[in-house]
Amino acid sequence: MAGSQLKRLRATLKAHGLTGQTNVKKSKNRKTSKEYDHEEKARVVSAIREQFNPFDVKANRSKLHAAGAGDAKVAVGKPGISKQIGEEQRLRFHESKKAQKNRAGGLIDKRFGERNKHMTAEEIMLERFTKERQAQSRQSKKSLFNLDDEEDDGDASGALTHFGKPLASDFEDGDLGVGMAGALGPKRGLADDEMEPEVPKKKTKAEVMKEVIAKSKFYKHERQKAREQMEEEIDQLDDEFEGIMSELRAAPRARTNPVESKPSQELEYDQKVRELCLDRRAAPADRVKTDEEMKQEREEKLKKLELDRVNRMNGLVDGEDAQGVEDLDNGFWEAEDSDAGEYGEYMEAIADSDDDLKFENEPETAEPTGTSHKQKKIAALPCPITHAELMDVLTAYQLEEQPHVVKNIIKAYQPKLAEGNKEKLDKFSGVLLHHILFLSSSDYASQADVIVEVQNSLISILKLMSEKYNQALSEACRQVVTEIQQRFKAQHYLGLKPSDLVFFSLVGYIFSTSDHYHLVVTPCCILLGEFLEQIKLTDYERLIFVAIAANICVRYQRISRRHVPELAYFLKRALASLLPFSTENSQAFNIRLDSDKLSLSKTLVLEDIEPTLKLRFLFLKEYDDSVQAQLLVNLLSTLDACVSQLWKGVSAFPELTQPFKPLLSAFASSYPTFAKPQQIMERMERISNLQQHFPLTLQNHKPAAIPSYMPKFEDNFNPEKKSYDPDRTRNDINKMKAQLKKERKLTMKELRKDTKFEARQKIEEQRKHADDYKAKMARIVNQISTEEGADKNKYEKEKRLRAGKR
């Protein structure tokens, strides 16, 4: 068994002669050790240290070990030493960077406002002006005693004084050597000529300064004299200015030659030239299209409109492309003159024509006869913005004249005539809607034909206005829907009016009811569903009201053919209530009735009766047999429309029509001469036979096979080859990418190490600073405590001495 780690270390050191007996008697013949022995000893000690500390050495394991490669070289690394070397390098770089901190020179841009994004041009100019004035102020303070300063105010603020009195200038022309030759006389001149040239004597500093001061005083005196002379001339000109101006005003003016007037022909020619310059260049006109081209364009437009309608019905139109209720183009009045949809032939009647609006199948209305001054009155018609204002305008006219007055108001306020007319007509469209509902809510049994004709004319006008004022009209309709819903929620059927049914009919006439979602039609459909389900059928008035609502609901769905559950529920209740049986017999149909007083008589005559229910039936106090017969025929017609239009393509058609078969059989047996129930049952049977109704089953899928792949083998396999791409260029690119990825990875690793080292050094510096501060404060506290202790001991000692003297 091998010994311990310590024993093996001792044995190894002793075997290499590093330990053991050292006082052995040296041989005289053996040479002494040299410096070489010390290096060899250090190498041996390092090898022994690595041998006994295997954790500092890392050997890479070969992944592809081949047989017979036992003596192969293995890559060996020393991560500990490498890490230590890296730490030492980072520490040296950190110390050098720290030593150069705040010492590196550089240019500082002191220009104000050059790169400031928050300062405007005016603020930058103001700041520059302020800096310039400050610099001038500092310069003026520095040049207060500058002898070379050119500015001199001539006051005593900068002059030399003695006891407050200015000293006289000791300047003389002789200081500059002027007239020196004349003072010395001709002898001096001759002497100078006879004298030999001598070396000029170097001036002393005092002489140079004296000469400089003299020159400065001379130049300053010259400038002062020139300034005084200029000021005198300016004062003289100012004094003589008034006299010169008075003489100039008194001088006669030279007469200018009058402009010769051009002949009339030249003036006309100049006028024509100016007009030609100002005229705009005419735009090229489109060529006249043939009948075939116009027909083809019309067909393409109709196809596009139908496709858009189908997309809206299926909810496939985006909000940007949909031309719904909320869309109102600001340039609508400037649109082209082509047909615009289903009612395009009427769109020019309001905005682009001065004639009256013309509708199909409308008789000519008479001119207003309420006033004598017709044209003036029409021209002065105001545009009402409320229904009360419209009633004030219409009070002066008869009932049949109201459509003509409304047309005149629309023509008088066309958007092309004045600014703001478009907004006025927007509001007027809502006012016209309220007026139509107002006419519908009044009892007009005495003049029913006139009111119906007026209503139809106003509805036609409203339809035309809806083509251009869709947004304003839709907002007014939504307000009406909200009002109806609030009244129905508060008072149920008692809160409803006959005009509400007219409103729902108008919505179906004006807006597209086949859209998947519509801002006006969708709330109306929800409200109609509430009427069909929640109104209790206790009398004929309510039954007629809901029957009309059901007919409107069927017309809403005539294109989209969506299923309305409330409609089927109402038809079952209504037909069961009208059965000519007693309550006990009606209970056999499993239908709960609201009243048993609505049963019809078996003696009713139902042949040749129109299925239309008129709105004036709601104002009747008694309902005779004719009204009851029309009610029954109307309900059966509504059921027939549901069967043949709405429910025909529904997969649950047998389930929907099953509850109606007993009811229809009962009506057929009660009224044998009335063929409508039997026709509806036959239609139900035909549609049921054509439909194939299968129960729901799970979808049967073919089992998917488990994929199997053959392994891929390389014919020319080489473990040293990393890519088998035959394209040399692509291979080089991939190699470059791999190398770049590797270098980037190593660089990021080094950056992370540097960041961590910087963080450790920062924490170490903060800790060192905190320790120094703590030691400093402790030293100060100890010093203060020592001084206080010494003072305290001294005080105690003096106190004891005073006590001992007593």
UniProtKB/Swiss-Prot annotation:
InterPro entries in alphabetical order: Nop14
GO cellular component: Noc4p-Nop14p complex; nucleolus; small-subunit processome
Localization, UniProt: Nucleus, Nucleolus
GO MF entries: snoRNA binding; U3 snoRNA binding
GO BP of this protein: endonucleolytic cleavage in 5'-ETS of tricistronic rRNA transcript (SSU-rRNA, 5.8S rRNA, LSU-rRNA); endonucleolytic cleavage in ITS1 to separate SSU-rRNA from 5.8S rRNA and LSU-rRNA from tricistronic rRNA transcript (SSU-rRNA, 5.8S rRNA, LSU-rRNA); endonucleolytic cleavage to generate mature 5'-end of SSU-rRNA from (SSU-rRNA, 5.8S rRNA, LSU-rRNA); maturation of SSU-rRNA; ribosomal small subunit biogenesis
Pfam families linked to this entry: Nop14
Region annotated Disordered, chain positions: 1-41, 92-114, 130-207, 249-271, 787-806
Bias-annotated ranges (Basic and acidic residues): 32-41, 198-207, 789-806
Keywords: Nucleus, Ribosome biogenesis, rRNA processing
Primary role: Involved in nucleolar processing of pre-18S ribosomal RNA. Has a role in the nuclear export of 40S pre-ribosomal subunit to the cytoplasm.
Quaternary structure and partners: Component of the ribosomal small subunit (SSU) processome.
Record-stated family: Belongs to the NOP14 family.
Name recorded for this polypeptide: Probable nucleolar complex protein 14
